A protein has these predicted regions:
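Well-ordered alpha-helical segments embedded in enzymatic catalytic cores
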Residues: 69-73, 98
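Active-site histidine-anchored catalytic micro-motif
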Residues: 84, 92-144
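Catalytic cores of large soluble enzymes that bind and process phosphate-bearing ligands
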Residues: 41, 58, 62-66, 87, ...
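Short, well-ordered coil/turn elements that cap or connect secondary structure elements
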Residues: 1, 21, 78, 105-107
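Generic beta-sheet signal
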Residues: 4, 81-85
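Glycine-rich phosphate/diphosphate-binding loops that line cofactor/substrate pockets in enzymes
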Residues: 72-81
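Short beta-strand segments
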Residues: 8, 85-89
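N-terminal glycine-rich anion-binding loop in soluble enzyme alpha/beta folds
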Residues: 5-69
Length: 145
Protein backbone atom coordinates (compact mmCIF):
# COMPACT_ATOMS: atom_id res chain seq x y z
CA UNK A 1 0.00 0.00 0.00
CA UNK A 2 1.36 3.42 -0.98
CA UNK A 3 1.23 6.09 1.67
CA UNK A 4 0.00 9.60 0.79
CA UNK A 5 1.22 12.80 2.46
CA UNK A 6 -1.10 15.81 2.43
CA UNK A 7 0.44 19.29 2.26
CA UNK A 8 -1.43 22.61 2.21
CA UNK A 9 -0.84 26.28 2.90
CA UNK A 10 -1.70 28.44 5.88
CA UNK A 11 -4.79 29.96 4.24
CA UNK A 12 -6.63 26.71 5.06
CA UNK A 13 -6.71 27.87 8.70
CA UNK A 14 -6.30 24.35 10.02
CA UNK A 15 -6.25 24.00 13.78
CA UNK A 16 -3.19 22.43 15.44
CA UNK A 17 -5.42 19.47 16.31
CA UNK A 18 -6.42 18.94 12.66
CA UNK A 19 -2.80 19.16 11.53
CA UNK A 20 -1.73 16.61 14.12
CA UNK A 21 -4.68 14.26 13.62
CA UNK A 22 -4.00 13.79 9.90
CA UNK A 23 -0.23 14.51 9.86
CA UNK A 24 -0.73 17.41 7.44
CA UNK A 25 2.17 19.71 6.60
CA UNK A 26 1.38 23.42 6.29
CA UNK A 27 3.48 25.86 4.25
CA UNK A 28 2.98 29.40 5.59
CA UNK A 29 2.28 32.46 3.49
CA UNK A 30 4.13 35.65 4.37
CA UNK A 31 2.30 38.64 5.87
CA UNK A 32 3.81 42.13 6.05
CA UNK A 33 2.40 44.64 8.52
CA UNK A 34 4.01 48.07 8.81
CA UNK A 35 7.28 46.77 7.40
CA UNK A 36 7.49 43.71 9.66
CA UNK A 37 7.38 40.31 7.97
CA UNK A 38 5.55 37.42 9.65
CA UNK A 39 5.02 33.81 8.63
CA UNK A 40 1.30 33.12 8.81
CA UNK A 41 0.47 30.72 11.61
CA UNK A 42 4.13 30.49 12.67
CA UNK A 43 5.26 33.91 13.85
CA UNK A 44 1.79 35.46 13.96
CA UNK A 45 -1.55 33.97 15.00
CA UNK A 46 -4.89 34.95 13.45
CA UNK A 47 -5.84 36.94 16.56
CA UNK A 48 -2.48 38.74 16.58
CA UNK A 49 -2.96 39.52 12.90
CA UNK A 50 -6.33 41.16 13.60
CA UNK A 51 -4.86 43.22 16.45
CA UNK A 52 -1.87 44.35 14.41
CA UNK A 53 -4.03 45.09 11.38
CA UNK A 54 -6.36 47.27 13.46
CA UNK A 55 -3.38 49.25 14.78
CA UNK A 56 -1.56 49.39 11.43
CA UNK A 57 -1.07 52.58 9.45
CA UNK A 58 -1.46 50.67 6.18
CA UNK A 59 -3.31 47.57 5.10
CA UNK A 60 -1.22 44.40 5.46
CA UNK A 61 0.11 42.67 2.38
CA UNK A 62 0.63 38.96 1.80
CA UNK A 63 3.00 36.98 -0.34
CA UNK A 64 2.97 33.39 -1.55
CA UNK A 65 5.43 30.98 0.03
CA UNK A 66 8.86 30.91 -1.58
CA UNK A 67 10.07 27.98 -3.67
CA UNK A 68 12.48 27.29 -0.81
CA UNK A 69 9.64 27.04 1.70
CA UNK A 70 7.91 24.46 -0.49
CA UNK A 71 11.05 22.46 -1.28
CA UNK A 72 11.97 22.41 2.41
CA UNK A 73 8.62 20.78 3.23
CA UNK A 74 8.61 18.50 0.18
CA UNK A 75 12.10 17.22 1.02
CA UNK A 76 10.94 16.02 4.46
CA UNK A 77 8.66 13.45 2.80
CA UNK A 78 10.23 10.03 2.15
CA UNK A 79 10.63 9.39 -1.58
CA UNK A 80 8.37 6.31 -1.50
CA UNK A 81 5.43 8.43 -0.26
CA UNK A 82 3.12 10.12 -2.76
CA UNK A 83 2.41 13.80 -2.09
CA UNK A 84 -0.86 15.64 -2.64
CA UNK A 85 -0.26 19.37 -2.24
CA UNK A 86 -3.60 21.26 -2.02
CA UNK A 87 -3.59 25.07 -2.12
CA UNK A 88 -5.67 28.21 -2.28
CA UNK A 89 -7.14 29.33 -5.58
CA UNK A 90 -4.76 30.66 -8.21
CA UNK A 91 -7.18 33.57 -8.67
CA UNK A 92 -5.95 35.10 -5.39
CA UNK A 93 -2.31 34.05 -5.18
CA UNK A 94 0.64 32.56 -7.00
CA UNK A 95 0.88 29.84 -4.33
CA UNK A 96 -0.18 27.02 -6.69
CA UNK A 97 2.40 28.11 -9.27
CA UNK A 98 5.15 28.28 -6.62
CA UNK A 99 4.19 24.81 -5.38
CA UNK A 100 4.30 23.45 -8.95
CA UNK A 101 7.73 24.97 -9.56
CA UNK A 102 9.06 23.57 -6.28
CA UNK A 103 7.61 20.13 -7.06
CA UNK A 104 9.77 20.02 -10.19
CA UNK A 105 12.90 20.70 -8.10
CA UNK A 106 12.64 17.65 -5.85
CA UNK A 107 12.78 13.92 -6.70
CA UNK A 108 9.38 13.17 -5.20
CA UNK A 109 6.07 12.10 -6.71
CA UNK A 110 4.08 15.30 -6.10
CA UNK A 111 0.71 16.35 -7.47
CA UNK A 112 -0.17 20.01 -6.87
CA UNK A 113 -3.87 20.78 -6.85
CA UNK A 114 -5.61 24.16 -7.04
CA UNK A 115 -8.54 23.89 -4.62
CA UNK A 116 -10.31 26.88 -6.19
CA UNK A 117 -11.07 27.94 -2.61
CA UNK A 118 -9.52 29.55 0.44
CA UNK A 119 -9.90 29.40 4.22
CA UNK A 120 -12.22 26.75 5.65
CA UNK A 121 -13.52 25.73 2.20
CA UNK A 122 -9.92 24.77 1.37
CA UNK A 123 -9.67 23.17 4.82
CA UNK A 124 -12.71 21.01 4.08
CA UNK A 125 -10.95 19.56 1.03
CA UNK A 126 -7.69 19.10 2.92
CA UNK A 127 -9.43 17.34 5.82
CA UNK A 128 -11.27 14.94 3.50
CA UNK A 129 -7.94 14.18 1.83
CA UNK A 130 -6.30 13.69 5.22
CA UNK A 131 -9.03 11.32 6.42
CA UNK A 132 -8.84 9.32 3.20
CA UNK A 133 -5.04 9.13 3.29
CA UNK A 134 -5.17 7.99 6.91
CA UNK A 135 -7.69 5.30 5.92
CA UNK A 136 -5.28 4.00 3.26
CA UNK A 137 -6.71 5.58 0.10
CA UNK A 138 -4.37 6.14 -2.83
CA UNK A 139 -3.70 9.60 -4.15
CA UNK A 140 -5.77 8.83 -7.25
CA UNK A 141 -8.70 7.77 -5.06
CA UNK A 142 -8.38 11.00 -3.06
CA UNK A 143 -8.27 13.09 -6.24
CA UNK A 144 -11.34 11.28 -7.59
CA UNK A 145 -13.27 12.27 -4.47
Amino acid sequence: MTKVKIITDSTARLTPEEVAQYDISVVPLTVMIDGTVYHDGVSITPSEFIEKMAASKNLPTTSQPSLGAFTEVYETVPEDVEVLSLHLTHHLSGTVQAAEQAARLVPHDIVVCDSNYIDRALAAQVLVAGRMAQAGATRDEILAE
